[in-house]
């Protein structure tokens, strides 16, 4: 059974260790990548050994976050998961299972978190794990640099659909404003994350529209892609996080 921590207690746990492994979930999205990267750079600022491990490659659209990827170069004192609701979400690749048998810390915003970690910072009302991690990094007295702000904004904006989802609250916008004040490149990030599509994504959309169906007396429109069609378009599955528009 996990023990629930508050923000300050989580910050103290992280400050007490020198070698820290950060775990993201498989098929990584903007929140888990953004949090993993932001925490890595915060720990680096404290002159700690840290690295990020994920079962799957970081999607190209998030390459700018550029965390150090774990290659087994140190023995972790603490394993911390970010935006991971259950052990099953870690995946099997990259030797991840070796480090998921005992997860020390978890920072998450999913109300259904299974409580797999020894200690958990959980707020099911938060729009993204990045919203919680921002508070943790501040509690660690680490400066929110422009790059850390970019990473956290990536998590915050992608998990809220660019602040369109119902999970978005006033506090979400306040956190975003603080990240802007810290130097987050919001205009560039919004263009990259929400307005830029690869040629492969455009091809996938073209194929999907061939399946257009109307239901509920025309009030609902449905499109879809089969696995074979995804392979045919050669689209990166990460590029399909956002719905076709």
Task: Name every feature range the model reports, one short phrase each.
Residues 2-9, 85-86, 137-139:
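Short, motif-level signal for alpha-helix interfacial/capping segments enriched in acidic residues
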Residues 48, 102, 142:
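Short glycine/serine/threonine/alanine-rich loop segments
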Residues 63-119:
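Active-site cofactor/cluster-binding pocket
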Residues 11, 68-70, 93-96, 120-123, ...:
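A generic local secondary-structure boundary/capping motif
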Residues 2-61, 70-78, 158-245:
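Hydrophobic helix-and-loop "lid/oligomerization" segment in the mid-to-C-terminal part
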């Amino acid at each position: 059974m996990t023990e629930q921590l508050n923000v300050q207690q989580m910050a103290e746990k992280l400050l007490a260790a020198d070698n820290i492994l950060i775990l993201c979930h498989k098929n990584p999205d903007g929140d888990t990548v953004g949090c993993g990267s932001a925490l890595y750079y915060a720990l680096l600022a404290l002159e700690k050994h840290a690295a990020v491990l994920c079962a799957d490659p970081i999607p190209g659209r998030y390459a700018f976050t550029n965390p150090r990827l774990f290659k087994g170069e140190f023995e972790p004192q603490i394993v911390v998961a970010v935006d991971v609701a259950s052990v099953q979400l870690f995946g099997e690749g990259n030797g991840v299972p070796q480090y998921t048998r005992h997860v020390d810390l978890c920072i998450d915003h999913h109300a259904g978190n299974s409580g797999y970690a020894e200690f958990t910072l959980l707020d099911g009302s938060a729009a993204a794990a990045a919203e919680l991690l921002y508070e943790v990094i501040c509690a660690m007295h680490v400066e929110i640099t422009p790059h850390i702000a970019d990473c956290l904004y990536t998590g915050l904006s992608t998990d809220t659909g660019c602040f369109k989802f119902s999970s978005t609250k006033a506090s979400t916008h306040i956190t975003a404003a603080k990240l802007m004040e810290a130097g987050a490149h919001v205009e560039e990030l919004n263009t990259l994350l929400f307005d830029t599509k690869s040629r492969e994504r455009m091809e996938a959309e073209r194929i999907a529209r061939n399946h257009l169906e109307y239901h509920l007396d025309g009030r609902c429109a449905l499109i879809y892609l089969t696995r074979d069609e995804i392979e045919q378009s050669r689209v990166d599955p990460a590029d399909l996080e956002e719905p076709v528009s």
